[in-house]
C-alpha cells in the first residue's frame, strides 16, 4: 500500500495552474462541501492506493473542457483508491449524500465500488455503473437507500441532466456512524486489464433536492416514463385510438390465418398417430417424448402467457403525488380509476419499500377508457350531456385479449389470468392454488413471498382442503382447464450454493421451538435413528449433553462435513419427507375435489433435489420458472430425464430498458430488438427437450413504471405496453416463433407410425 500526503508545494507541481483549473472545473452545487479536490489537493486528507496509482503529476483536460485527475486501477483482485482524514475522523452527520465527480477514461462503462467505513469497522457500500462519456456527479446516499424507498424496484435511467450537470444516483447498503467516518474508498472489482478513471473531487451534499428532483414528474398522464422516447410511446388520445384501429385490421388477418391450421377445438395438433380421448387434459409419453393430450385426444404443446388480466396497471400514488405529472383531479372523469389498497404484508418482497399502501391509480384502465370508452351523448335541450359511468368494458377487453393471444400463436392462459377468460371456452387455462391459513411456517433464509408452510401441521391440511375446494368449485367438470399449480416460487432453499442455503429448510426448522410440528417431526426422525444424544453427538461431531438442548429455540445445527456424512444424510432425509408430505397433502385434496385435472407442480424459482423428487412423485407435471436464455441453463435436464416426468416452463421472460419501465426484469437484454430472437431461441431449445410440454411467457402487460402494487416491480416484461399498445416488432417475432414451434411438432408427429 502506498500513502500519499499532498503538501501545498507539491500541489503546485502536480496540477495545472490554479487559474486554469478554476476556469474548467465543474461548478459546486449549493449545499455541497468539497472533501478533497484531486485537481487542487490540500494536505488535510490522506490519499492511499493499493494496486492502483496516479501516474501523471498534472491533471488533464477532457474533451468537454473539465479538468480531472487520472487514476489507474491495475489488474488485481480489488485495486483501490482510499481517502482518510489526516487525523481523527470525519463528521458527516449533516450530510445526505457522498458526491464524486467521475468520468470513465475508457471506451466502455466501469463498475466502481464505493465503501464508506466507520471507526468501528462498519461499512456503507455502493456499486456505481459508470457509463462511458462525459464526467458526471455521482451521488451515494449516506444511509441505506434504493429505488424501493420511492416505491419501485428500479429507478429512472441515469445519468440525467440536473442543474447543468450529469447526475447519477446510486443505491447504498449497510450503515455507518456518520459522526465517526474513518475512510472512503473507490475500487474496481477484478479488472483483467488496467482501467482508467478520471476524478475531480469528493464531497458531501447536505440536502436531497437533486434526489427529489430525480423522481419529480417522472410519470406522464398515460403511465409512461417522461425520461425517454421510443416508437410506441403515446403522446395523445388520438394516437391511442389510431393504434387500436390499426391493430384491429392486423388481428383480423392473423386470425384468418390461424383458422386454416389443423387444430382441434382446444388447440391440439391434428397430425400423426391418434391418442385416446378421455374428455380432459392429461399427459402421455410416446416414443420417448412427453405430451399434453387434449380432451379430444390430440397432442398439445402449451404456449401460454401469464397474468392476462386487466388490473395490472395499478400503482400507488399516495404520498408520492409529485412523481406523477398529470394525475386526474377529483372532478375529472378518469378519477373513477382511483382505488385503495394495502400491500404491507411483512414478506421480504415488501421490506425496504415505501409507498406500499393507500390510494392507487389504474393507468391501464384509464388508457383503455381513452382508447375504447363510450363517448358522452350530446346534451339535449335543458339537459346535461349523458355520460356513461367510467368502468372497464370487461366483455370487450376479454374478447380483445383472446383475439390477440390466438392471433399471436398462443394457446394457453397462464397463471393469474382473468378467470372469465378461461370460462369463455376459447382457450385452455390454468389456475393457481393459493393455500393460506394459520398453520406454522419455517424460514429458510429467503422468504421472498413468505415462509415455508409446515405440512406436518394439521392446520395446513385443513387450509389445503379449503383452498382446493374453493378453486375447484366452478371448474370440476370443465374440459378447458388443464390443471392447477401448487402455489408459486416457495422458498425451498435460500439463494446460493453453500450448505446453509442448500439445507435452509433443515436449519430453519431446528432453530424453531417444539411448538412447530415440523421440528417435532425432525426430532422424532433423529431420535428414531440415534436413540439418544450420545449417538447423535457421535454421528454429527457435536457435544450434546442432553437431548433437550435440541428442543430449545435457536439451536444451531452443524454444517455438513466429510468427516461426519450423517449430518447431510439427515438433512436430506428430513427435507425429502417434508416435501413428500407437502405435495401428498395437495395431491390427495385435488384427487378428491378435482380428479379430472392435472397437478402442475410447484413453479420452482429455487428448489432442492428433495423438493423436485417429491414433486415428481405426487404431481402430474414438474414446473419451473426459468429466467435464463434457454431452459437448459435453469436446471440439470439429465437429472430431470431420470425422473421421467413431463416438464412445463411456467415462466420465462426477456426485457430491456428502452421502452419506458425502468426494470428489464430478471433477464436483461440490451435492446427491445433483441427480445424477439431471444424468445425464438428459447422455444427452439425447449423443443429439443422431449420432456418439456410447454412454455409460458411472463407476462401479458408491462408493469407500471412507478411500480406495481404487490412489490414495486416495474419491469418491461410485456407483450403489451401500459397504454394497451402491443410492441409490434416483438409481437411479430413471437408469432413467427410460435408458428414455427407448432410446425416443428406437427412434422415430428407426422413421421411417427401409428401404435
What are these regions (language model features)?
Residues 144-155, 166-176, 182-192, 203-280, ...:
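N-terminal accessory beta-strand-rich subdomains and adjacent acidic, glycine-rich linkers
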Residues 658-668, 707-714:
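Histidine/acidic-residue-rich catalytic or RNA/ligand-binding cores of hydrolases
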Residues 1-12:
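N-terminal secretory signal peptides that target proteins for export/translocation
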Residues 230-422, 440-477, 564-565, 569-572, ...:
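Active-site-adjacent substrate/metal-binding segments within catalytic domains
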